[in-house]
Design a protein with these regions (language model features):
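Conserved helicase ATPase motor motifs in RecA-like P-loop NTPase domains
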Residues: 1-2, 202
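Short glycine-/polar-rich loops that comprise or flank the Walker A/P-loop
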Residues: 2, 123-125, 195-197
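Interdomain hinge/linker at the junction between the two RecA-like core domains of SF2 helicases
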Residues: 2-67
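Conserved C-terminal RecA-like helicase domain
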Residues: 48-182
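A cross-taxonomic marker for long C-terminal extensions/tails that follow the last structured domain
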Residues: 174, 188-190
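Conserved helicase core region in the C-terminal RecA-like lobe
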Residues: 183-187, 200-202
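A short beta-strand element within the Helicase C-terminal
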Residues: 192-202
Length: 202
């Protein structure tokens, strides 16, 4: 038998007797130590944190859902604060993010909650729901639009937004903070190369 371990740095093939747990552990641990060492030499590409969810085990299901959705809202505001850009024309703080949930029903419920809940003063949100059960024509148009808007190659802190729909929202919204939120299921990950300012991932 042989054990094959691979990552983005290398592939190791080690001879090993079938069922030899101690040999497997030794080879695997050596591979992981080398991987951690290699990753430590790479530049940091993304940073993340775990958002605490304060639901109590004694809460009702409805209270747990509300608490969960509220934690998502709080994370969005925090991420917007840290990762927004400035619109060149209006000087408003703008961010584009994704809330990625596992299933369609929670995707729709999170979207509805984010559209109806209270946000900090001076904050407006625009929410789009994106999942695989949408009417195909709608989904096709959504995907075309998302591919256009989220193919952003600029790293500038000030952006001159040209998209007609985005521009309309920026020009007509009185709030100084505008957060564009895509609430999506894993369909967002299939063949998409979108550039978001932030993400909340279930």
């Amino acid at each position: 038998c042989a054990l094959v371990l691979c990552d983005e740095f290398r592939t190791d093939v080690e001879p090993m007797d079938s069922g030899d747990d101690s040999a497997y552990r030794k080879i695997h641990d050596r591979f992981i130590r080398k991987r951690v060492e290699n990753l430590g030499k790479e530049p940091v590409k993304r940073k993340g944190y775990i958002q605490p969810c304060g639901a109590d085990d004694n809460d009702t299901d409805a209270a747990k859902k509300t608490s969960y959705f509220e934690n998502i809202r709080e994370a969005i505001e925090k991420l917007h604060e840290n990762h927004h850009v400035i619109d060149k024309k209006t000087k408003k703080r703008v961010s584009f993010g994704v809330v990625r949930v596992a299933n369609i029903t929670p995707c729709v419920k999170v979207s509805l909650y984010l559209m109806k809940c209270g946000w900090s003063e001076g904050t407006a949100v625009r929410v789009m729901t994106y999942h695989s059960r949408q009417i195909l024509l709608l989904r096709h148009e959504q995907e075309r639009y998302l591919d256009k808007v989220f193919t952003r190659k600029t790293q500038s802190a000030t952006v001159d937004f040209q998209d007609e729909t985005v521009r309309k929202h920026l020009d007509s919204t009185p709030e100084e903070n505008i957060i564009f939120i895509l609430v999506a299921t894993p369909v967002e990950e299939v063949g998409r190369d979108h550039d978001f300012d932030w993400a909340v991932v279930e």
